[in-house]
């Protein structure tokens, strides 16, 4: 290939676009809300379109084996930086850009005006998220994690008050320790193998000597602690409920995505490096991951039942989701992973919608409510009076109530929506994976998933009764059209995921089959050659 077709450069757009837009937003005056929102929403729309294009390319015949490789600065891997797109990466990019768009629309005329630099930090967070999904080497994964976290530190404190500052400081301290563990783990892996490229590491790991194998496993374990801290695995996820309850609604919705990055990193690295072809290190640590996932699931279920606050319930719901996904990764297999990815899609969309919905439902409750007082305190940081929150739209109670029910059903896994489809598929896949004698650990996982679902529906219905039936409020709460549109869009996607479950499962089946063909990645990543520049012929004078 003598020249690089322009369409191949789409791979780097999800990283470059938010970086450029975030930098452009910094010098713009803080009072120019309309211009900042226009740039932010324009970036979000373009990111969504690029992500969908990458998904179509990965699922089509554009790239061999459905894997696209982009060599940054035209340096070949493993020395150069390689960005890799497959079906899983593209799916996560589409999910991220979809939720980001909903959050940006929700934030218009309210949360983007409480505090400073909301849109810039939001773009830098998107850069870190997208880069973490795209990169194929461990050091750049660390770099993108830090970009994502640095932006999230500012966003968690956005619209600051005492409670938010306390939770934010805890969040920052925990993630700084996790980042240190990440860096130590990466250093140990490099000392053992001499490479940080994931595809190259997968090829070198089986040939390592006993001492280097031991060092590699220690490094992977330390690095996994960092991933699992960000993914909220018990007991490392103690920080999450308080942070969710204290963060502003748009930031809480993005934190739902950030917990999934930790789970994604474990899935990506472990399937590539410790897959079926890893020799003696095959499936290293998966039993511990399964046990930790089940413990996380139980912890989340107990936490939901004990919570009275909607934000804390959302936090424990995210912990249940992470625990389920971690336990599923431990039970590797095409059908199990496909069902797990379907569960990831449904739970993430529903949890993001629920985080946005919580703020709107707080407007129904009496002014003495602790959560409403917290929100009012956050808005009081402005020197000037706040703009009106919105108007009482017709059917507001009906819209909020139906949206709440849909989110509750999907989060808990109750029929007939996507959460139930995901859990039923997981049960079937887990039982079918052991046709002769089903291990007791599988039965325990299924039981814990049922318990987690029951705990979630009990807690959420209790919250719903308190908000919609026992609040004593007759007047419709103020609501902006943009807020209703963002929540309605996410709820509609949850419904569409249910209706189109067959097509989605077909795609996820192809995704997991590609992931389990781990030999394709070294061939594509290490086999990709730099573009040969065409020499320019000198024009005779």
Predicted feature locations:
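C-terminal ends of transmembrane helices
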Residues: 22-33, 100-112, 153-167, 231-244, ...
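Transmembrane helix-loop-helix hairpins at membrane boundaries of multipass inner-membrane proteins
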Residues: 1-12, 23-122
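Cytoplasmic/organellar membrane-interface segments at the starts of transmembrane helices
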Residues: 247, 369-402, 453, 457-541
């Amino acid at each position: 290939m003598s020249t690089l077709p322009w369409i191949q450069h789409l791979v780097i757009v999800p990283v470059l676009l938010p970086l450029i837009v975030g930098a452009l937003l910094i010098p713009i005056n803080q009072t120019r809300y309309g211009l900042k929102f226009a740039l932010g929403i324009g970036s979000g729309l373009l990111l969504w379109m690029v992500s969908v294009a990458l998904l179509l390319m990965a699922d089509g015949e554009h790239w061999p084996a459905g894997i696209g490789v982009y060599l940054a600065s035209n340096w070949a891997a493993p020395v150069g930086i390689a960005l890799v797109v497959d079906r899983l990466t593209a799916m996560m990019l589409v999910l991220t850009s979809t939720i980001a768009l909903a959050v940006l629309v929700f934030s218009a005329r309210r949360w983007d005006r409480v505090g400073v630099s909301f849109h810039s930090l939001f773009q830098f967070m998107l850069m870190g998220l997208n880069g973490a999904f795209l990169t194929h080497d461990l050091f750049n994964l660390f770099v993108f994690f830090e970009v994502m976290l640095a932006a999230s530190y500012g966003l968690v404190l956005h619209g600051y008050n005492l409670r938010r500052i306390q939770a934010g400081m805890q969040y920052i301290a925990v993630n700084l320790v996790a980042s240190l563990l990440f860096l130590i783990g990466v250093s140990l892996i490099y000392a053992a193998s001499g490479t940080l490229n994931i595809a190259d590491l997968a090829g070198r790991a089986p040939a390592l000597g006993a001492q280097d194998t031991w060092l590699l496993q220690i490094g992977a374990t330390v690095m996994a602690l960092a991933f699992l801290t960000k993914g909220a695995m018990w007991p490392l996820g103690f920080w999450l409920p308080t942070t969710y309850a204290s963060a502003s609604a748009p930031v809480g919705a993005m934190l739902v995505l950030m917990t999934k990055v930790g789970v994604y990193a474990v899935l990506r690295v472990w399937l590539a490096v410790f897959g079926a072809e890893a020799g003696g290190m095959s499936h290293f640590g998966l039993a511990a991951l399964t046990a930790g996932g089940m413990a996380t699931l139980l912890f989340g279920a107990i936490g939901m039942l004990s919570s009275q606050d909607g934000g804390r319930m959302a936090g424990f719901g995210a912990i249940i989701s992470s625990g389920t996904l971690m336990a599923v990764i431990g039970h590797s297999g095409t059908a199990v992973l496909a069902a797990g990815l379907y569960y990831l899609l449904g739970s993430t969309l529903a949890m993001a919608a629920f985080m946005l919905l919580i703020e709107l439902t707080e407007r129904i409750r009496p002014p003495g409510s602790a959560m409403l007082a917290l929100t009012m305190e956050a808005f009081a940081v402005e020197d000037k009076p706040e703009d009106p929150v919105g108007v009482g739209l017709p059917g507001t109670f009906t819209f909020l109530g139906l949206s709440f029910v849909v989110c509750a059903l999907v989060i808990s896994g109750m029929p007939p929506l996507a959460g139930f489809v995901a859990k039923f598929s997981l049960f079937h896949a887990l039982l079918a994976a052991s046709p002769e004698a089903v291990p007791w650990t599988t039965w325990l996982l299924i039981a814990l998933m049922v318990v987690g679902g029951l705990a979630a529906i009990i807690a959420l219905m209790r919250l719903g009764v308190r908000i919609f039936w026992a609040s004593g409020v007759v007047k419709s709460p103020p609501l902006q059209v943009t807020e209703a549109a963002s929540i309605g869009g996410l709820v509609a996607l949850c419904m569409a995921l249910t209706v189109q479950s067959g097509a989605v499962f077909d795609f996820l089946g192809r995704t997991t089959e590609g992931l389990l063909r781990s030999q394709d990645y070294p061939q594509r990543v290490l086999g990709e050659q730099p573009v040969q520049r065409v020499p320019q012929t000198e024009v005779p004078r």
